[in-house]
Amino acid sequence: SITGNKSSVAGDYALSATSKTVAATITQKSLTESGLSVAASRAYDGTTAASVSGTAALLASETAGSGTTSDGKPYTGDTVSITGTAVGTYNDAHVANATTVTFSGLSLTGAQAGNYSLTIQSPASATITAATLTPTITNTGVTKVYDGTTSSSITPTYSFTGLVSGDTAATLTNTGIAYNYKDVATATLVTVSGLSISSITGNKSSVAGDYALSATSKTVAAT
């Protein structure tokens, strides 16, 4: 039809062409990946690395024209699959703040891969638990003159096993230091009790809560 004030009709005109074009694009359909998992927790190691299990996979394909453009499924007949090595990364390296692991390292491959983009599965819930720290009292030649009590005035020094790479030492506090007996004949050791971690030294920014002591009291030979 023709619009105007001349009462024109379609037959009064002839088109210059029976087809015309306009610029347009087709955007990629997003495919959903699933199948990866991580352990519910792991011990502190000073990094955000998480060990990934499972196999990344796409949803089952569907016939072109069916489903929706947002259903995450490839179309039957298209050659597209997942390639790469899945990497898991904690949101934080430290015990107090680590709550989730995100996945990365995957992409699409195949003749029709360019028609799609990949949506990696949602982060997994996971935590980091304290690493076990074992202190050993390194004082030698611990002794005192008999004073009728079990008190000891030593300042404990320690060596440690269980520090993660990059951490070099820990500062410990205690609530008591005492001989096992007060008498010369029976006194054989000093016990440092009520041990707790005050701070960690190293280049990992580790804090006391990233470690748990293997025991809250330690002994050293003494006379």
Residue ranges and their predicted role:
Residues 1-223:
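Short loop/turn motifs that initiate or flank beta-strands
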